[in-house]
Amino acid sequence: MVKVYAPASSANMSVGFDVLGAAVIPVDGALLGDVVTVEAAETFGLNNLGRFADKLPSEPRENIVYQCWERFCQELGKQIPVAMTLEKNMPIGSGLGSSACSVVAALMAMNEHCGKPLNDTRLLALMGELEGRISGSIHYDNVAPCFLGGMQLMIEENDIISQQVPGFDEWLWVLAYPGIKVSTAEARAILPAQYRRQDCIAHGRHLAGFIHACYSRQPELAAKLMKDVIAEPYRERLLPGFRQARQAVAEIGAVASGISGSGPTLFALCDKPDTAQRVADWLGKNYLQNQEGFVHICRLDTAGARVLEN
């Protein structure tokens, strides 16, 4: 039996639309992510468990874990009879890389079960392909950090899909999921087809400056440059209370904040534990909309997806 855990991730990080993402783990030791178990069997079977299992498609072939198994078998050119279990702990359409968690855990578990026939680059390419079936286009800003850990910059040149960018140990990521769903496809459809020249220049300056600040170890500058002129101005209308929440967390002391992925989760970066706690408390009282919502104080998950049992 192989059991694999794949962590939540926060894509875009305001400054890097479709090209930056960070894997996260709660500071209290809770596992914020999906778990997939693979065992040898006579025929294929899939069982769904976990807090959000009831939100999965009722038709097994529509389940992304089934599609991962099918695509992995196709890649190897043979049927691999296994019993798979998906522990769906991540809310769907949350902006926390929920589909990436399932895809990464499923493909990594299959690869481990079969003795690692695929290298990490090929596996990551498959992960992007499968996650793209849900989001509507192939992009790696959730699957890469989820699989490899840390903060990842998408490269997609010279057979390199992504590479790690150094993060800051003192940064705490407060993630507030309000409990409502925003579909990635809908959030992409709301974006303009063309952008003004000054927005393109500002975006390039912010992203280049952010990467420079990470490598030159300037956390204050990096946080200041986490601005979004590409997606947030258009997407915030999909997120009730988002603008007020951003203003409130800034007043409390967050050094940066924005939409995690395509939302509705809000991320707030803090450089002090007491500030992070106050931000988390405010968001818990004011940004959450129902019982399914939650707030976690997290750090970068530098390990990425990992085998829990083998």
UniProtKB/Swiss-Prot annotation:
Function comment = Catalyzes the ATP-dependent phosphorylation of L-homoserine to L-homoserine phosphate.
**Any one Gene Ontology biological process term?**
threonine biosynthetic process
Please name the NCBIfam families in this protein's record: PRK01212.1-4 (NF002288), thrB (TIGR00191)
- Record field: catalytic activity: L-homoserine + ATP = O-phospho-L-homoserine + ADP + H(+)
Q: What is the lineage of its organism?
A: Bacteria, Pseudomonadati, Pseudomonadota, Gammaproteobacteria, Enterobacterales
UniProt pathway annotation? Amino-acid biosynthesis; L-threonine biosynthesis; L-threonine from L-aspartate: step 4/5
The species this protein belongs to is Escherichia coli (strain SE11)
Give the UniProt subcellular location, in the record's own words: Cytoplasm
Record's keyword annotation contains Glycosyltransferase: no
Alphabetical UniProt keywords: Amino-acid biosynthesis, ATP-binding, Cytoplasm, Kinase, Nucleotide-binding, Threonine biosynthesis, Transferase
Name the residues that bind ATP.
91-101
Which GO molecular function terms does the record list?
ATP binding; homoserine kinase activity
**What is the similarity comment for this entry?**
Belongs to the GHMP kinase family. Homoserine kinase subfamily.
Entry EC number(s)? 2.7.1.39
**InterPro entries associated with the record:** GHMP_kinase_C_dom, GHMP_kinase_C_sf, GHMP_kinase_N_dom, GHMP_knse_ATP-bd_CS, Homoserine_kinase, Ribosomal_Su5_D2-typ_SF, Ribsml_uS5_D2-typ_fold_subgr
Its cellular-component GO annotations read:
cytoplasm
- What protein name applies here? Homoserine kinase
Enzyme class, top EC level, equals: transferase
